[in-house]
Design a protein with these regions (language model features):
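Conserved SAM-binding strand-loop segment of SAM-dependent methyltransferases
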Residues: 102-106
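N-terminal Rossmann-like dinucleotide-binding module
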Residues: 31-98, 177-180, 281
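Short amphipathic alpha-helix with an adjacent loop that forms part of the alpha/beta core around
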Residues: 109-116
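Beta-strand-loop-alpha-helix segment that lines the small-molecule cofactor/substrate pocket
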Residues: 126-127, 131-179, 193
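N-terminal secretory signal peptides and thylakoid transit peptides that target proteins
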Residues: 12-35
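C-terminal helical cap and adjacent loop that interface with cofactors, partners, or active-site loops
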Residues: 30-38, 245, 253, 265-285, ...
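N-terminal Rossmann-like NAD(P) cofactor-binding module of classical short-chain dehydrogenase/reductase
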Residues: 121-122
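Predominantly a Rossmann-like dinucleotide-binding segment in NAD(P)-dependent oxidoreductases
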Residues: 61-65, 69, 167-172, 177-295, ...
Length: 517
């Protein structure tokens, strides 16, 4: 593993600028003109100001994670806020916090009217809107920070990756654990042979913490005047608005937050969390296209929503990778490593029937025989984590983000924290660390903002060139769940060879007026 030949493992009232009736022709016309007005796609900041100037940021989706994504950019100029719902507490709070920002309900109007004033956008909408919003901004050469999962379909992930590369857009996906020193240390040491050839990866999460396995509700409720339901649906098929299943039900049906379990809008527990929890092994093992994906749902699986839990197998072939010797931006100093085939297991939700659980515990975690050392380390298996098993040892990460890890080499009796294991001293730090502070969320955003100011997309550790591939892999698990069978995947052709019925879930047919183009 230490040489080239050894194998490796101005706020206005909402109504004054709100409309979901912007025509597609007018929007394309105006966005094309705005894009053409930019000097070779370079952000406005770099065309007329020095690098110490503040960026003009527009934030699309300001509730939930959108609140923290907006606040992470607070030291820049927040010039626009956009959200389809003006009844939320986030709307009241954020519009007050950023009084100089103009408010919109419709992101298309925002880009149409303010495109020349915007350097970058953050996108924190439901999953089904990510690609639509991101592509519109990128066509206008705006830098993009988009929440995970990057997209809702495999086709969209590949589409955004290609666009970002061709237009040289500064991009970042919101898997903030990427900013952590611990994750980067795990990646470089595993690549350099810390635990030898890795043959198994097990990743688990306590999600979903929202409703799943439900049928579409009957009936229809009046759409609140504060919500643009047509715009909220975006590319998804039209359906009646329904706020609650009954007047006594405290849980919303679609929004906010609980859209995650619906197949038309979210990506279930896998899409919501795998871009965090699989991030570290994906990078460390240089995972490319899987050849097989097989999902086993727990409980009811219907055509409307994801199941209460699942176990999914991803099979990856042997592969080669080129990694930097010292620094990922020194492109002429690389070495080739080789990885053996690897099986990645994903676990989410729970299995309430002890008779059906086999070797797994009730919270749907890896087999008990694989987690004994974890229990010895901390008394129990955590609700989320990942385990990499190599022929020279094991790495265990105990959280959602891969930000910390423990090492147990072959012949050792117990796990030790990576900062206290002597074996790591032989592996140099060759991946640059994020210098922007201890808060991974703020540091992750600052890395993106700094890259925009330098016009260097490669400075973003979660740029779309990398994270679109991660998203694509995980979304294939959603496809396998929806078709109800194993998928034999042809990555280069983007085709399920044995399952033609998977095609609509790989590239969906968007509602009229919402096609990617």
């Amino acid at each position: 593993m230490r040489n080239q030949t050894k194998k490796l493992p101005l706020k206005k009232s909402p109504g004054s600028v709100s409309s979901s009736q912007v025509s597609r022709r007018d929007f394309i016309k105006t966005t094309s003109l705005a894009a053409g007005a930019l000097a070779f796609g370079v952000p406005a900041l770099l065309r007329g100001q020095n690098l110490n100037s503040k960026l003009n940021i527009a934030c699309i989706g300001i509730g939930g994670k959108g609140r923290s994504d907006t606040d992470a950019c607070a030291d820049e100029n927040i010039v626009a806020l956009c959200d389809v719902d003006t009844a939320s507490e986030a709307y009241a709070t954020q519009t007050k916090k950023y009084p100089g920002a103009k408010f919109y309900k419709d992101f298309r109007q925002m880009l149409d009217q303010m495109g020349s004033q915007i350097d970058a956008v953050t996108i924190s909408t439901p999953d089904h809107m990510h690609a639509i919003v991101a592509s519109a901004a990128m066509k206008m050469h705006k830098a993009v920070f988009c929440q995970k999962p990057l997209t809702q379909t495999v086709y969209e992930a590949r589409y955004l990756r290609k666009m970002a590369k061709e237009k040289k857009i500064v991009t970042q996906m919101g898997n903030q654990g990427s900013a952590a020193d611990g994750l980067r240390r795990a990646v470089e040491t595993i690549q350099d042979g810390l635990i030898g050839q890795v043959s198994q990866v097990h990743v688990w999460t306590n999600r979903p913490v929202w409703p799943q396995a439900m049928d579409r509700p009957l009936g229809e409720d009046p759409v609140p005047k504060t919500l643009d339901w047509d715009l909220w649906l975006g590319p998804a098929p039209m359906r009646p608005y329904k706020g609650r299943r009954n007047p006594d039900d405290e849980n919303a049906i679609y929004e906010p937050f609980v859209w995650r379990g619906w197949q038309d809008f979210g990506t279930g527990a896998l899409g919501d969390m795998a871009c965090h929890t699989v991030n570290m092994p994906f990078r460390a093992l240089d995972l490319g296209y899987p050849t097989e994906i097989e999902a086993i749902p727990f409980g009811q699986m219907n055509k409307e929503s994801y199941p209460v839990g699942s176990k999914i197998r991803f099979q990856f072939p042997a592969r080669k990778a080129s990694i930097p010797l010292e620094h990922p931006h020194l492109f002429h100093h690389h070495r080739t490593i080789e990885h053996d085939a690897v099986t990645l297991w994903w676990y989410d939700g729970g299995q309430p029937d002890p008779a059906a659980r086999g070797g797994h515990d009730l919270s749907n975690k890896p087999p008990i025989e694989l987690t004994a050392d974890i229990v010895a380390l901390q008394g129990e298996v955590p609700e989320s984590g990942c385990l990499l098993i190599g022929d020279g040892g094991t790495v265990f990460s105990p959280d959602d983000y891969g930000a910390s890890f423990f090492v147990k080499l072959k012949g050792e009796e117990k796990f030790r924290h990576f900062t206290k294991h002597p074996a790591l001293a032989q592996y140099p730090e060759r991946i640059p660390r994020n210098p922007y502070g201890k808060s991974s969320g703020l540091a992750h955003a600052q890395e993106w903002l700094n890259a925009i100011k330098q016009n260097k997309p490669e400075l973003c550790y979660s740029r779309f060139d990398i994270t679109a591939r991660l998203a694509e892999i995980m979304l294939l698990g959603c496809v396998s769940l929806r078709v109800g069978q194993k998928i034999e995947w042809d990555g280069p052709k983007m085709v399920a060879k044995n399952c033609p019925q998977a095609a609509p879930f790989i590239k969906r047919e968007n509602r009229s007026g919402w096609a990617l183009s």
